[in-house]
Amino acid sequence: APGNKAECEREKGYCGFLKCSFPFVVSGKCSRFFFCCKNIW
């Protein structure tokens, strides 16, 4: 799972504050309060 913003974006994800919006799910971490969100489709 991604552990920072660069890794998250490389995996075509984005950093969401505390949660992710559908259809994205938490799939890692960007920083303390930001989670890496990835599309489930």
Curated annotation (Swiss-Prot):
Entry superkingdom: Eukaryota
Ranges in a coiled coil: none
Role of this protein: Has antibacterial activity against the Gram-positive bacterium S.aureus 1056 MRSA (MIC=1.25 ug/ml) and the Gram-negative bacterium E.coli O157:H7 (MIC=0.96 ug/ml). Has antifungal activity against the yeast C.albicans 3153A (MIC=6.20 ug/ml).
Name recorded for this polypeptide: Ostricacin-2
GO cellular component terms attached to this protein's record: extracellular region
InterPro entries: Defensin_beta-like
UniProt keyword annotations, A-Z: Antibiotic, Antimicrobial, Defensin, Disulfide bond, Fungicide, Secreted
One record GO biological process: defense response to bacterium
Homology family: Belongs to the beta-defensin family.
Subcellular location: Secreted
Natural source organism: Struthio camelus (Common ostrich)
Disulfide-bond pairs as recorded: C8-C36, C15-C30, C20-C37
